[in-house]
């Protein structure tokens, strides 16, 4: 009987692993990491930055709202300068006497188109600015008076229009109380002549006036 020995390399090896020191869990003896406290001045800095940003946003929204309100009130308000200017220009352009004084080249089929603009800052027509001059005043009765002037130009002549309007109690549009045009070489022409104030004299006694005059 012959015994054969197996080589050692062919014998399977069994390896033993120890879990000692390789546990993923935390033992009861380990200390938890301490969280660092944020300094007070860091918190104050963050709070200050947030407050400043909030104020800037709120301020920007407020300024934008005011600007938008002013633009809309100027463009669409009946008492705004734009609406008042357009009404005055239409009224002056439709006046036949004004067109004659400006020597407009009108025919039965077509009328010359006039140019209306504000002040002449420079003599150069290409670079001059043309803002409309307008002011407002409150009289002793609490009514607002609107004063405006602008130029009206034809191909041959140039005139300066003066306008006065007063806020109306019946409607939202101011009423024109005075409007005239000055043209070089021509007499002043009134499109709307202002009404003269009536002076009421007190009753007299024995032919002599009693008391002061009242306007």
From Swiss-Prot:
Q: Which UniProt keywords apply?
A: Membrane, Mitochondrion, Mitochondrion inner membrane, Protein transport, Transit peptide, Translocation, Transmembrane, Transmembrane helix, Transport
A GO biological process of this protein is: protein import into mitochondrial matrix
Mark the transmembrane ranges.
Answer: 56-76
Range annotated as the organelle transit peptide: 1-15
Q: Does the keyword DNA repair apply?
A: no
In the bilayer, the protein is annotated as: Single-pass membrane protein
What's this protein's function?
Essential component of the TIM23 complex, a complex that mediates the translocation of transit peptide-containing proteins across the mitochondrial inner membrane. Required to keep the TOM and the TIM23 complexes in close contact. At some point, it is released from the TOM23 complex to allow protein translocation into the mitochondrial matrix.
Known partners and oligomeric status? Component of the TIM23 complex, at least composed of TIM23, TIM17, TIM50 and TIM21.
Q: Which family does it belong to?
A: Belongs to the TIM21 family.
Q: Under which name does UniProt file this protein? A: Mitochondrial import inner membrane translocase subunit TIM21
| Gene name of this polypeptide | TIM21
């Amino acid at each position: 009987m012959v015994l054969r020995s197996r080589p050692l390399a062919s014998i399977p090896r069994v390896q033993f692993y120890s879990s000692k020191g390789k546990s993923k869990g935390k033992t009861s003896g380990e200390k938890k990491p301490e969280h660092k406290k944020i300094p007070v001045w860091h918190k104050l800095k963050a709070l200050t930055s947030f407050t400043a940003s909030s104020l800037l946003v709120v301020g920007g929204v407020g300024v934008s709202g005011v600007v938008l309100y002013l633009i809309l009130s100027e463009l669409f308000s009946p008492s705004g300068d734009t609406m008042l200017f357009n009404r005055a220009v239409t009224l002056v352009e439709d006046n036949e006497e004004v067109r004659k004084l400006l020597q407009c080249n009108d025919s039965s089929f077509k009328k010359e188109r006039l140019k209306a603009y504000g002040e002449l800052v420079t003599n150069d027509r290409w670079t001059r600015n043309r803002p409309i001059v307008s002011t407002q005043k409150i009289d002793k009765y609490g009514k607002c008076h609107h004063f405006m002037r602008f130029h009206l130009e034809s191909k041959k002549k140039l005139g300066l229009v003066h306008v006065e309007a007063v806020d109306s109690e019946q409607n939202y549009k101011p009423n024109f109380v005075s409007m005239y045009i000055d043209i070089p070489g021509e007499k002043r022409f009134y499109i709307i002549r202002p009404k003269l104030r009536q002076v009421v004299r007190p009753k007299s006694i024995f032919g002599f006036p009693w008391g002061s005059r009242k306007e």
